[in-house]
Amino acid sequence: MSAEPKETTASVRMSVAEKSSVEERAKSLGYKSLSDYLRALAASDMKAVSPTLIQPRITRPVSRYHETNLGTMWNGDSLDWMDSREAESVNLIMTSPPFGLVRKKSYGNEDAHAYCDWFRPFAEGFKKILKDDGSLVIDIGGAWKAGTPTRSLYHYELLLMLCNEYGFHLALEHFWWNPAKLPTPAEWVNVRRVRPKDAVNCVWWLSKTPFPKASNRRVLAPYSDSMKSLLKNGYQAKTRPSGHVISEKFGKDNGGSVPPNLLAIANTESNGTYQDYCRKRGLDIHPARFPSALPEYFIRMTTDPGDFVFDPFGGSCVTGAVSEALGRHWACVEMNSAYLEGAMSRFEGDPIVLAKDKPSSYTIFTPCAAQVMENAVPLVADGGAARPKK
């Protein structure tokens, strides 16, 4: 506080109980007097309502790292790339930004508390470059609060921010289930046994208008055996107990079934071409690569051949490689040149394998199907607050 003498006095009317409460609060915060506390409150309030001068960004050049017939890998900051990009010139932004993990990793995670503030400049850029009928797809993993078996809400706060502040529409939330994911977090899953394993990422499919161009006919899954039998033997139209009317059209062969928004895609590329390429050259392996089938799904469903796909957090350039294989123009921007050096493996030798060339299905068993005697397995009464004794 200022050491200058205070020549002006003022009266503040409050009850005895209110005065006592305020004085107690001021004392607990270390203020020597009630006056000092009230002046500090006023200064804080004035600072909160004062406009903050936002310094304009100085656009820096991004360097062209590698170019193909259809796309380019860029080394630099994607904010700079978007600053110089023509407005409404991108059909799909497909990306997996650094997750706001509580335990920061080597690839540049922001503290989850500040994640939305960190993301805002990117949201501005996305809104600028995306076409009105385009899509923004964000694969984003969850985070655990440090020291507790409870979840951060940062990825939901990000979704709300993009919709409420920037006017994006949630076309449909998707959930990427990785059947090969290890039981994590180990402390709560394997040690204290108070949570099931976290094996799903949220994937937000957003758009500038409620009606982005799309077709689910582009991403059909094979029919199940029961549906194949129904198509072969016919189906009698009827009303189900739920009240839904199943018409004769239900028995029409449409070439495949419409997939759900639960995407079962194993991420099992631990010993693939990309890793071998990086290991032989002593390069950093990007720690958060999504499988090629994930961008393939959205690229097929929301873009046409010749459209433009952009990944602002390019990493090992999976999005670019899939876009190239599907005949889309593309750009991937990555700040770490070592990751781009490893990404070269995706454009040398054999092209990336698409989903149609490696069809697969996964079985997930019904929870509670394994026989367990409840009397022999007591609940963890303290909710996992203490580690079990060995």
Give the residues covered by each predicted segment:
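Short Lys/Arg-rich basic patches
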Residues: 1-27
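A generic structural micro-feature
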Residues: 4-6, 38, 194-198
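Short, basic amphipathic alpha-helical segments that act as recognition/interaction helices
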Residues: 21, 28-54
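Short, flexible loop/turn segments with low-complexity composition
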Residues: 53-57, 217-222, 353-364
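Core catalytic lobe of class I
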Residues: 58-342, 379-390
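Conserved SAM/SAH-binding loop
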Residues: 75-80, 360-369
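C-terminal helical cap(s) of enzyme catalytic domains, especially alpha/beta-barrels
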Residues: 340, 344-354
